[in-house]
């Protein structure tokens, strides 16, 4: 029954205005795309324990228009440098200090670098040649350059979250949003 009403509304709108139906479609598509971005960002933030804002700003939305009713979501799936998590500080561990003459894996008397809410043992902060500051760590097994930037892998969580959520949200929300957008366009046309 709802589909018949929707078809009739589309037909009436297309008689009145040429751009009303494509405008409603573009509006619905943009709403669905932006909700897919926000839900996927929330899911990835929970999985990786990174602030949602940092995840969300990696997704870019090219909005749908009347002439081109396709929204395009572009996601930066590169690893996230740990320095972006927040302030970095060195915290002294409260463990008992080693006795004189004993060796310990914890150099510097047991201090640990904490960035945001993550503890990174054996890490240090350094300015690179390009002028950026990064959290670095010694990497075992790398002969030539044995230090590397500490990063959080984001490719797998971002890919899985976006693939799951885009399909699900398109199925669930697009018909509703299309109905709302058509009603909105109808109100706009009637007001004129």
Swiss-Prot record:
Entry keyword Lipid metabolism: no
Q: Which domain of life is it from?
A: Viruses
What are the record's GO terms for cellular component?
A: host cell cytoplasm; virus tail
Key word Electron transport present in the record?
A: no
**Cell compartments where the protein resides:** Virion; Host cytoplasm
Sorted keywords for this record are: Host cytoplasm, Late protein, Viral tail protein, Virion
Q: Which family does it belong to?
A: Belongs to the Lambdalikevirus tail completion protein family.
Role played: Stabilizes the tail structure and acts as a connector between the end of tail and the portal vertex of the capsid.
Q: What is this protein called?
A: Tail completion protein Z
Q: Which organism is it from?
A: Escherichia phage lambda (Bacteriophage lambda)
State which gene encodes it: Z
